[in-house]
């Protein structure tokens, strides 16, 4: 699988949609504006769900926008060639998405007032979700077994690098008032409460009926049926068994796939790598 990567500044980037030259430009040239809103995640953490919620909050629950424009056009990917081009030419407030680790992100962000929503998911579920996602595409040649992918994940030799370093890097920003941290598990447990939290962060005041519409149209089933959100528009030659972007949308699926030995190995790495964070900070602990 490593043949599908380009290494840049110690991070393996997916060849199929990220070019090193664009990432360099993002880091050195891209100007973040104070009125921008940035959705940041490590891959397979619920990114598209968050995009859907944020878009629906902006329209007060009206689904016309999310049902007529693909999500990668509503919130372009900063590190993709097409997304970068759109964002650099767009005037006014911009909504954008990125998986980049903190050391590759736009330097201009750190002196701006732009708002960031950073979504975190249990890395065990991230690992399993990522494996099955790539297994269903033609984007990866010779995908190894889950066991080997497990080892690669713990070493950080997967797309966008180490989950642990990604989290450490971005969570260093968590005390800033323009940086909102969300957890996938909390979203699953209390989606409405999470939507309200995002509204408060963005200064948006939605009524009860509008909140219910956001909840309705951002549900797993609604997104699965929305061709603008389920990636069914992706060219067929890029996929094999259908691009399973939305496989289960559950928490705890890793328990169906990890062996006892893998569970113990993961727990040890997690404890070693996440030292320094307060106990109980992560909802899956």
Curated annotation (Swiss-Prot):
Keywords: Cytoplasm, Lipid metabolism, Steroid metabolism, Transferase. It is an enzyme of class 2 (transferase). Its main location: cytoplasm. Gene3D superfamilies: P-loop containing nucleotide triphosphate hydrolases (3.40.50.300). The active site is at residue 99. GO terms for molecular function: sulfotransferase activity. The keyword Ligase does not apply. It catalyses: an alcohol + 3'-phosphoadenylyl sulfate = an alkyl sulfate + adenosine 3',5'-bisphosphate + H(+); glycolithocholate + 3'-phosphoadenylyl sulfate = sulfoglycolithocholate + adenosine 3',5'-bisphosphate + H(+); taurolithocholate + 3'-phosphoadenylyl sulfate = taurolithocholate 3-sulfate + adenosine 3',5'-bisphosphate + H(+); 3beta-hydroxyandrost-5-en-17-one + 3'-phosphoadenylyl sulfate = dehydroepiandrosterone 3-sulfate + adenosine 3',5'-bisphosphate + H(+). One of its GO terms (cellular component) is cytosol. It is found in: Cytoplasm, Cytosol. Oligomer. Sulfotransferase that utilizes 3'-phospho-5'-adenylyl sulfate (PAPS) as sulfonate donor to catalyze the sulfonation of the hydroxyl group of hydroxysteroids and bile acids. Belongs to the sulfotransferase 1 family. This is Sulfotransferase 2A6. It comes from Mus musculus. The gene is Sult2a6.
């Amino acid at each position: 699988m490593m043949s599908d990567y380009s290494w840049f500044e110690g991070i393996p980037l997916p060849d199929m949609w990220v070019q090193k030259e664009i990432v360099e430009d993002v880091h050195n040239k891209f100007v973040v504006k104070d009125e921008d809103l940035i959705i940041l995640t490590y891959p397979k953490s619920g990114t598209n769900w968050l995009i859907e919620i944020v878009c629906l909050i902006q329209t007060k629950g009206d689904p016309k926008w999310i049902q007529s424009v693909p999500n990668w056009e509503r919130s372009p990917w900063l590190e993709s060639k097409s997304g970068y081009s759109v964002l650099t030419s767009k005037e006014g407030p911009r909504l954008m998405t990125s998986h980049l680790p903190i050391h590759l992100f736009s330097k201009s962000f750190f002196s701006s007032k732009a708002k960031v929503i950073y979504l975190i998911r249990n890395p065990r579920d991230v690992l399993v979700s990522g494996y099955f996602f790539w297994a269903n595409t033609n984007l990866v040649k010779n995908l190894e077994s889950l066991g080997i992918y497990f080892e690669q994940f713990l070493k950080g030799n997967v797309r966008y690098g180490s989950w642990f370093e990604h989290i450490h890097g971005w969570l260093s920003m968590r005390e800033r008032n323009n940086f909102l941290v969300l957890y996938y598990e909390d979203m699953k447990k209390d989606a409405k409460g999470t939507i309200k939290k995002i509204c408060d962060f963005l200064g948006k005041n939605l009524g009860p009926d509008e909140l219910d519409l956001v909840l309705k149209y951002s549900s797993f089933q609604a997104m699965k049926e929305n061709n603008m959100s389920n990636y069914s528009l992706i060219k067929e030659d890029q996929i094999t068994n259908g691009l399973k972007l939305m496989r289960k949308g559950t928490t705890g699926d890793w328990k169906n796939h990890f062996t006892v030995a893998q569970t113990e190995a993961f727990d040890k790495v997690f404890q070693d790598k996440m030292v320094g964070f307060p106990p109980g900070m992560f909802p899956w602990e």
